[in-house]
């Protein structure tokens, strides 16, 4: 929005041309979203407390979690508001990738909001029934996948890139739609499963989002893309503004979500952020790198799959409790130790993901 204004004002003062720089608008996106989250956070927490919108805690979980009962939830609305406002202010709204990522994020956030509303406000422990949750996730995921497939400007935009192998890629054709669907929906649910401890999901999301922002910037620049042997995706660089907003909003939310949390993001935040990461990774053709960098999300998801499959097949549980962060808690790890160690793992995995830019 402000970019369009700056372009108009350039005829009166050439200094406004500085807003053409993606890096500047990315930084402004971070600072704007961070400021919004920090300023609106206390008000939102008070509002949630006054309306008694608090988290319910399972009795069969770690005993240390019982003290969390009643902590305000649905704080993900703060993250989405900060991301949305910052992106609309600083991104080029003529760029269709910006709208795809923003609309997917808000759509999955709406699914999470309905789920949280039914659980917290209507006191329905089931929330939004799983079949309806996955139905709407499928609708929005497939919608985004089909749109990206139909608007692809070159074959490389629908080709699966294999990291570290410069001469190996797989043309997907219509299979691009299937892969994109699974990446978006899978990423959304993986982040949601990870969101079980104070700050556990948001910091890895920020780190992975920041790394994807680097991929967006490089993929959107033809010279960098050619030098690094990554797909050149015209217009993808503009997503650095969204990624910047995600970083700022995430850090602002972490201010209130760090142990002991004053607010939880709820499904409204977790489902939306996961879908955003998946959509961005698809656009810049880095699905496998997302799998690497988001290893914590993958580990959490696999722990649930393994636990359920093992119990159904053998009647035994592999872990003391799933997702796996609860397993470590029940082993005696203090919650902050679990959180920080998962953060450290994410730092390592993100560095490995970034290293694939040169390892070819």
From Swiss-Prot:
Q: Which UniProt keywords apply?
A: Cell cycle, Cell division, Cell inner membrane, Cell membrane, Cell shape, Cell wall biogenesis/degradation, Magnesium, Membrane, Metal-binding, Peptidoglycan synthesis, Transferase, Transmembrane, Transmembrane helix
Q: Does the record bear Lipid metabolism in its keywords? A: no
Q: Please report the record's description of how this protein sits within the membrane.
A: Multi-pass membrane protein
Q: What is its main location?
A: membrane
Which GO biological-process labels does this protein carry? Answer: cell division; cell wall organization; peptidoglycan biosynthetic process; regulation of cell shape
Q: In which pathway does it act?
A: Cell wall biogenesis; peptidoglycan biosynthesis
Cofactor(s) for this protein?
A: Mg(2+)
Could you say which EC number(s) this protein's record lists? 2.7.8.13
Q: Which CDD domains match?
A: GT_MraY
Query: Where is the protein situated, by its record's location annotation?
Result: Cell inner membrane
Q: Which GO terms describe its molecular function?
A: metal ion binding; phospho-N-acetylmuramoyl-pentapeptide-transferase activity; UDP-N-acetylmuramoyl-L-alanyl-D-glutamyl-meso-2,6-diaminopimelyl-D-alanyl-D-alanine:undecaprenyl-phosphate transferase activity
A single GO CC term for this protein reads: plasma membrane
Family matches, as HAMAP family: MraY (MF_00038)
Q: What does this protein do?
A: Catalyzes the initial step of the lipid cycle reactions in the biosynthesis of the cell wall peptidoglycan: transfers peptidoglycan precursor phospho-MurNAc-pentapeptide from UDP-MurNAc-pentapeptide onto the lipid carrier undecaprenyl phosphate, yielding undecaprenyl-pyrophosphoryl-MurNAc-pentapeptide, known as lipid I.
Q: What is this protein called?
A: Phospho-N-acetylmuramoyl-pentapeptide-transferase
Gene name as annotated: mraY
